[in-house]
């Protein structure tokens, strides 16, 4: 590989790892298939200060999407919601959408109204894609969201990123030490292990998110989980995987 930087210097390497997030101009240059299809989803992220337990992660649904609430660095609360353009486009801006749609959920309204924004304005992410991606593209080993993104509703994206980095780094070390004979074998083994580790979780995540996007069905599913709480750890187990083993 030869990589040219903005300062016109050139770097050469036997290995390149792609860990540049869910969507980038690099994807366009690599002509990855998922980038050719428009996604109907957009995300909004806000950090606020207020009262929220350190050991709690909350998920609240609203018409057209869902919102996650969790404590992050600097004692801030992270509010991040995903919705579709169909639900969003009828409102003139984010504030109007939140007032008219999100705040129909009383719990979300209480969190937003009883906190103070820490960003000058909310961060928006358009074209969020949950489509299948290839773990290896043009001989580049892809990690994290670059290799595949799970719905925040039902998976730990940061955990997936760390796990895929572990898979990739261990195999790359074996390759550089001559334990894996060829580049083709390295790419094949990484693809095999990545799919074995994540494919089922991604499929379950897509299915759960699809069901919760159905406005008429989501309240019934939540009622079902309240009546049968033993189902929740089973769902978590299917979407979050196993603890990592450190060698």
Language model regions located:
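C-terminal helical "tail/cap" subdomain of flavin- and related membrane-associated enzymes
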Residues: 170-247
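Short capping/connector residues at structural and topological boundaries
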Residues: 35, 53, 64, 77, ...
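FAD/FMN-dependent oxidoreductases across multiple families
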Residues: 10, 89-171, 180
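Predominantly flavin-linked oxidoreductase catalytic cores and closely associated redox partners
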Residues: 1-111
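FAD-dependent flavoprotein oxygenase/oxidase catalytic domain
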Residues: 83, 106-118, 125, 206-222
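Short secondary-structure transition/capping segments
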Residues: 34-38, 86-96, 158-160, 222-238
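Short acidic-hydrophobic sequence patches enriched in Asp/Glu that either
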Residues: 36, 40, 90-94, 164, ...
């Amino acid at each position: 590989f030869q990589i040219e930087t903005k300062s016109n210097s050139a770097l050469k390497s036997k290995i390149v790892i792609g860990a540049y997030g869910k969507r980038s101009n690099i994807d366009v240059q690599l002509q990855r298939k998922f980038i050719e299809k428009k996604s109907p989803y957009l995300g909004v992220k806000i950090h606020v200060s207020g009262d929220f337990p350190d050991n709690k992660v909350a998920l609240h649904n609203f018409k057209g999407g869902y919102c996650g609430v969790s404590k992050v660095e600097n004692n801030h609360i992270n509010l991040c919601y995903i919705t579709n353009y169909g639900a969003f486009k009828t409102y003139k801006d984010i504030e109007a959408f939140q007032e008219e749609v999100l705040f129909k959920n009383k719990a979300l309204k209480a969190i937003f109204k009883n906190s103070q924004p820490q960003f000058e304005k909310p961060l928006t992410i358009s074209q969020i894609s949950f489509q299948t991606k290839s773990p290896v593209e043009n001989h580049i080993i892809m990690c994290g969201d670059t290799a595949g993104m799970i719905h925040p509703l039902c998976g730990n994206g940061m955990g997936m990123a760390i796990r895929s980095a572990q898979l990739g780094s261990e195999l790359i070390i074996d390759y550089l030490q001559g334990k894996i004979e060829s580049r083709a074998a390295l790419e094949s083994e990484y693809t095999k292990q990545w799919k074995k580790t994540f494919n089922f979780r991604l499929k379950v995540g897509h299915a759960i998110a699809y069901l919760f996007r159905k406005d008429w069905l989501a309240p019934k599913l939540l009622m079902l989980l309240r009546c049968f709480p033993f189902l929740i750890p089973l769902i978590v187990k299917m979407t979050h995987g196993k603890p990592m083993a450190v060698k």
